[in-house]
Amino acid sequence: MANEQKTAAKDVFQARKTFTTNGKTYHYYSLKALEDSGIGKVSKLPYSIKVLLESVLRQVDGFVIKKEHVENLAKWGTAELKDIDVPFKPSRVILQDFTGVPAVVDLASLRKAMAAVGGDPDKINPEIPVDLVIDHSVQVDKAGTEDALAVNMDLEFERNAERYKFLSWAKKAFNNYQAVPPATGIVHQVNLEFLASVVHAIEEDGELVTYPDTLVGTDSHTTMINGIGVLGWGVGGIEAEAGMLGQPSYFPVPEVIGAKLVGKLPNGTTATDLALKVTQVLREKGVVGKFVEFFGPGIAELPLADRATIANMAPEYGATCGFFPVDEEALNYLRLTGRDPEHIDVVEAYCRSNGLFYTPDAEDPQFTDVVEIDLSQIEANLSGPKRPQDLIPLSAMQETFKKQLVSPAGNQGFGLNAEEENKEIKFKLLNGEETVMKTGAIAIAAITSCTNTSNPYVLIGAGLVAKKAVELGLKVPNYVKTSLAPGSKVVTGYLVNSGLLPYMKELGFNLVGYGCTTCIGNSGPLSPEIEEAVAKNDLLITSVLSGNRNFEGRIHPLVKGNYLASPPLVVAYALAGTVNINLKTDPIGVGKDGQNVYFNDIWPSMDEINALVKQTVTPELFRKEYETVFDDNKRWNEIETTDEALYKWDNDSTYIQNPPFFEEMSVEPGKVEPLKGLRVVGKFGDSVTTDHISPAGAIGKDTPAGKYLQEKGVSPRDFNSYGSRRGNHEVMMRGTFANIRIKNQIAPGTEGGFTTYWPTGEVTSIYDACMKYKEDKTGLVVLAGKDYGMGSSRDWAAKGTNLLGIRTVIAESFERIHRSNLVFMGVLPLQFKQGENADTLGLTGKEVIEVDVDETVRPRDLVTVRAINEDGNVTTFEAVVRFDSEVEIDYYRHGGILQMVLREKMKQS
């Protein structure tokens, strides 16, 4: 294991205490000691704030983390709390390969830049443990067959040879860094089942020191680990890199919304149903940028796997985290997953000693606000067609879908004519079979994603649905692409041991890979004859998946409606073959006896599910899969690389290139100066996601990125995905704002990455227009609506924005991670004042924009913006500068956080 985080050199508050377990004495930094010395009512704090407080208490150094940070945070929830940012230094960082590759590319580039000025490149090394889990690269090229897993894995290694060689070099070249090989599982499930310690116990100066396991991760669903009492959240790769290199994350003291759970889930409902309902409730509550902490009697009714499912969805409900404190169930899960019994005793003793152990009779913490969720009122549901917060009760799914068909095109509508509902197409498949697809036909049914494939209750449930369906003689229609991508090999183990996997295979839910697959858009192609027929007839087809995101254009370019559902519901809908059905009342199909088969005929009871989970999910299964996790993938271990400190960049590589972020960087940082002469390159509406800004999926051959790759000799069949090519800025610049579903209001009549180049009036690709503006040394601006940058913690959404020459984004509101990423890349986030937006101000996008920002700017200041139209008329308005802390102004001066880190390392060297 990598080196651990060091504690502070001095015990400033005399808070270092001891506890004893199993005959050993452990040191810890006592929160009670703060309260005893009169520094705040610490015992009343939310558990999540206590973990934050322990982190700053333990790491006070008088420079980065000061006494005032501790004293202030201890006064959380009182009138004495000051507007001082929290400097958070997590104990570790976790990466996945789509975001991890560009992060490691940046580290390699930092080393090159350091060496270029005569510095020591070894100064660029992670200072805390970093785990990278390779899970995002496998694609579902083949599905529904016995050899699908092997074929997809072969293609994964073939496509990603350059990337994997680079990551293999990194594990040798960097300290404190290890990589979990491909085909192991999904990062968050591997974290939950294996990597997380919950409490660290390290030897320091001859003494054993304990403290909470905390982390940041380059994936927004890092929050899944909150389910076991580990505080952590997703950040952009840029922020994670800075954290690896010793920089704290700064953020305002968070509000904490208490989510009080009462009651018990009814029979027939799942953790997925609850998670989707929680997402809807908390989105409506408004928790963006806030912590959510779960408490109340309902917690005791939820197994750890269900808590992890709910915590996983925190980005979808908008919260920074969705925290469940450590309790007896967390300890039970550590036992279930085969953790060391002595360490589990340390976890319990530490948490009890430091007031971090939750018990049913504990007094409720003090929260900013409380929302109550009654588990007994949860019903089976789905979410869609384009956002995870748009909840649809199962009983209302058909009715809702019919309304969505004819509703105006947008988040909850497709904008079709009423007669489109009855459209159908008939054609032959390659095997000669005839098929009929109608509006609403399900083209993809995928059991996928970290959210649900970590949960044995919903996976066993899906297997039981399959078993009952097969026994009754039901089959999946031949146009449905079915797939099963478990989050870890443990899942396969218990599906085999329970005898359910053969039934899932019988319905086409064969193993396709251990990774994110369909949930992130790696759904692979549909059969060519299906793609041709659907495209030719413009048929509206759908997907049903057990994922966490269903944004437009994400799952498959031809699939316009995407619905999130539990794994058992995915199987049920796959059997039906359409979302235009009332599963509660209509027959799903006809059985082998000629009788109609209904939903209740195949739906398992909780007693059936619980019995199989208890019988088949065992500690031995977890130990078996993880004891040799770093050695099992021979192809990974046979990759030949060097351990040299400096990476040998290959100019001909189309996967890995040295990015230009540090070219022509001055020794000293610049100043905050007014922005003049900006042209509008994009004018967008609400809910522009990071998928819209920087897609992860397929690269079209006629897109700027596709043309670049073809010029480099890459054939379209070898394009791979945008996500896999995030180590090459040339591809990613061209892919910025290239989502096929993005709608730019200043390129009317188009869909996709187009804009109007104002000097000539020509409609062209956003990339080509930006390059022309760059030649003219014209800065650019983007105008947007609410929730700009929602979705994945995709740093390339900000990196690409920067490289295109966009100097500022003016939006009605920003999602947390993307706003931070813009600042980290030296792009100014501005927010319209409440009640104003581009349309209310009469902005068409043709204007020249000026922003009066300078060295006097402070966090959340109002600045004057002028929009000068073609006739010279000026619209003047004020916007909020979304620097949320003083240090963010420094990042902006430096041109970005990595430039600041490099300048500091240069001085040290």
Curated annotation (Swiss-Prot):
Cofactor(s) for this UniProt protein: [4Fe-4S] cluster
UniProt EC number: 4.2.1.3, 4.2.1.-
Keywords for this protein: Iron, Iron-sulfur, Lyase, Metal-binding, RNA-binding, Tricarboxylic acid cycle
Chemical reaction(s) catalysed: citrate = D-threo-isocitrate; 3-hydroxybutane-1,2,3-tricarboxylate = 2-methyl-cis-aconitate + H2O
Induction comment: By citrate via CcpC. When citrate is absent, CcpC binds to the sites near the citB promoter and blocks expression. When citrate is present, it causes a change in the interaction of CcpC with its binding sites, resulting in derepression of citB. When citrate is very abundant, CcpC activates citB expression, presumably reflecting a change in the interaction of CcpC with RNA polymerase. Also induced by decoyinine and nutrient depletion.
PROSITE patterns: ACONITASE_1, ACONITASE_2
CC annotations in GO: cytosol
Subunit note: Monomer.
Protein name: Aconitate hydratase A
